[in-house]
């Protein structure tokens, strides 16, 4: 890109002066190639120094992004002599260097030293610096296996270790903890070499780290090393939204941010979101998606972002104009939202975040990472939901999520208000908590009469839930919201068993059980036993009975909503229209007397909005655009 240095530096100057960006980082792909390894740092830093000189003259600080250190795994032009990553679960070799290899450590240390000699204002280590957050679930090369066997006093092969961990018995758990420790320690040791290279030139240069994976895989330790002595610790979380084919499932980026921020336990000084538009044009990511992504990342706890707004594969400046315009317009919006978010108390449907990070090493571990309620149902219905280890509201669990929590934590859930889908209820029963659910759960045989539909009380019917199980009440106190029926002869509805039940247990809690699964493929045969207005009314009644529904959108638009108490007793409501229909006005059911409704504006100010009231229905006289986040303050 050197031939476009004038245009690029002018663009950077515009971004910094207009609050679009604070500091540009120049990408350096250092994953070694060749034997001996090519000195990529020398080649790339020479180019960076040309840009840095121009930016220094403009008074603009700049830094370096070590975009690849051990490698993201893509095909290389030439192999290096360093030990390669060997997949833990499949034994395959990847185009990734093992961070235990002493030769590689010296290579990356010298590379960091060369970058530091250019006097960057910041050095960020990118998220290829990971081992378990890959499809192969860790490095089991000879170096890593030797470290593991030394730690445990064993002589296991990769295959034997993987088999033991998959069993998940006492020995398997011991080996799991040791394996995780060895993987993280190898990264931490390598990060120390990178920092040593920087410190050998200038120990005051600040650094940061980009983590990858919900488990946060040693992120705070690595970020603390990269920061350098007496510098703030900064971590970029891994909540990218590359090439999203649809606004649907946007909740995944929220959940990833929330999970990683929880795993970091408040330790870093700064947390940045990954609002990367990769591959950096609007055929991949719209400016609206970028704005929504940044907005909801702030609501999950990010204090800024590592943006990537510029095409780097080729010089295509027009591809970033809409991104810059959107971010510049909303600078005040982001700053005000960042100011008020830390003092919010979240309300509504609570997706609990485990207190201990969940490392996905085996196929069984994948089942723990449920996304049913938050990414298939609640995110479409305009019912407030939040991801949190704390906060208020009814706890929603699906799949095998119970395995992420201790017995004590499950009892705490059961002592409050909890909603389980059929798979989650099975997990609670297997753990010995069946008596608190009020029902037994049985998987049905395919030869049994099919579940044609569901009667929703007090009136209405719809398709049966996906993957429905049979619920059998265990107490006269078990109440039912629905019944599953078999349609006989195309006319007769033969009721078979309850579809949704509620039970007040001896712990003082109320447990709602759905017979089906909240996780399903999005298709007309699978999704619409859940995604319909009758089911939405069913959920509204349940949440109203539980007393956990302070506000909601009552109609059939695809609305994602978050709600929270403000520190002065007001109500914040964050709304995202995920459908393709602009709403001319916004109806809301609000369970409180409302004096005013204000909108957070792009410049950070608040605009009063007009509304009409009819009982609990408040109709806000303001349009809601497609994928345009709306932040309301309701007093």
Task: Map each language-model feature to its residues.
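The substrate-binding groove and active-site-proximal loops of carbohydrate-active enzymes
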Residues: 1-3, 29-45, 90-109, 171-189, ...
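Catalytic domains of carbohydrate-active enzymes, especially glycoside hydrolases
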Residues: 5-32, 114-122, 233-234, 292-304, ...
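Aromatic-lined carbohydrate-binding/catalytic grooves of carbohydrate-active enzymes
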Residues: 7-47, 70-92, 132-135, 139
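A structural motif corresponding to the C-terminal end of an alpha-helix
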Residues: 18-19, 51-62, 114-121, 189-207, ...
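Hydrophobic targeting/anchoring helices
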Residues: 26-29, 132-135, 197-373, 449-468, ...
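Active-site-adjacent "subsite" loops/lids of carbohydrate-active enzymes
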Residues: 61-119, 127, 131-135, 148, ...
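Conserved, mostly hydrophobic/aromatic
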Residues: 108, 115, 123, 198, ...
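A conserved amphipathic helix/loop scaffold
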Residues: 369-370, 375-376, 380, 387-390, ...
């Amino acid at each position: 890109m050197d031939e476009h240095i004038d245009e690029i530096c002018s663009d950077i100057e515009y971004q910094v002066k207009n609050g679009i960006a604070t500091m540009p980082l120049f990408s350096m792909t250092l994953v070694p190639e060749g034997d001996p390894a090519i000195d990529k740092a020398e080649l790339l830093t020479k180019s960076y120094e040309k840009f840095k000189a121009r930016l220094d003259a403009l008074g603009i600080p700049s830094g370096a992004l070590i975009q690849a250190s051990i490698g993201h795994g893509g095909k290389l032009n030439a192999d290096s002599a360093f030990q390669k990553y060997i997949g833990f679960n499949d034994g395959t070799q990847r185009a990734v260097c093992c961070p235990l290899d002493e030769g590689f450590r010296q290579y990356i240390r010298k590379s960091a030293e060369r970058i530091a000699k250019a006097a960057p204002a910041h050095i960020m280590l990118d998220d290829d610096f990971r081992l378990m957050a890959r499809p192969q679930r860790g490095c089991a090369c000879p170096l890593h296996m030797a470290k593991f066997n030394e730690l445990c006093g064993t002589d296991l092969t990769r295959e034997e270790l993987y088999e033991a961990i998959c069993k998940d018995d006492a020995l398997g758990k011991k080996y799991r903890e040791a394996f995780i420790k060895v993987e993280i320690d190898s990264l931490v040791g390598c990060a120390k070499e990178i920092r040593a290279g920087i410190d050998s030139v200038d120990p005051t240069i600040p650094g940061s780290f980009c983590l990858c994976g919900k488990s946060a895989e040693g992120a705070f330790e690595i970020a603390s090393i990269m920061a350098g002595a007496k510098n703030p610790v900064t971590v970029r979380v891994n909540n990218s939204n590359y090439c999203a084919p649809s606004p649907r499932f946007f909740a995944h980026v929220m959940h990833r941010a929330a999970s990683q921020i929880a795993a970091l336990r408040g330790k870093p000084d700064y947390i940045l979101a990954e609002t990367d538009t990769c591959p950096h044009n609007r055929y991949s990511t719209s400016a609206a998606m970028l704005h929504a992504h940044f907005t909801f990342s702030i609501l999950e706890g990010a204090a800024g972002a590592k943006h990537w707004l510029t095409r780097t594969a080729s010089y295509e400046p027009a591809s970033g104009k809409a991104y810059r315009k959107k971010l510049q317009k909303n600078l005040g919006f982001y700053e005000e939202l960042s100011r008020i978010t830390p003092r919010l108390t979240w309300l509504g449907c609570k997706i609990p975040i485990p207190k201990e990070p969940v490392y996905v090493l085996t196929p069984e571990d994948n089942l723990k990472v449920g996304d049913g309620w938050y990414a298939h149902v609640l995110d479409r219905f305009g019912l407030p939901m939040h991801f949190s280890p704390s906060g208020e509201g009814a706890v929603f669990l699906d799949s095998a999520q119970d395995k992420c929590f201790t017995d004590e934590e499950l009892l705490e859930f059961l002592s409050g208000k909890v909603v389980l889908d059929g798979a989650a209820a099975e997990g609670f029963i297997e753990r010995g908590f069946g008596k608190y659910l009020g029902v037994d759960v049985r998987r049905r045989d395919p030869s049994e009469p099919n579940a044609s539909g569901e009667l929703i009380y007090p009136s209405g019917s719809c398709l049966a839930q996906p993957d429905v199980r049979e619920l059998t009440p265990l107490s006269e106190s078990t109440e039912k919201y629905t019944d599953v029926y078999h349609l006989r002869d195309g006319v007769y509805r033969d009721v078979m068993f309850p579809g949704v039940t509620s039970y007040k247990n001896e712990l003082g809690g109320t447990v709602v059980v759905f017979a089906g699964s909240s996780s399903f493929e999005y298709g007309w045969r699978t999704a619409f036993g859940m995604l319909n207005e009758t089911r939405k009314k069913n959920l509204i009644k349940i949440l109203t009975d539980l007393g956990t529904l302070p506000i909601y959108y009552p109609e059939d638009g695809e609305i994602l909503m978050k709600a929270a108490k403000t520190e002065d007793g007001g109500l914040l409501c964050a709304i995202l229209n995920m459908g393709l229909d602009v709403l001319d006005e916004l109806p809301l059911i609000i369970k409180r007397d409302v004096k005013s409704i204000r909108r957070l504006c792009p410049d950070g100010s608040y605009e009063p909005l007009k509304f009409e009231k009819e009982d609990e229905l408040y109709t806000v006289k303001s349009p809601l655009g497609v994928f345009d986040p709306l932040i309301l303050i309701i007093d």
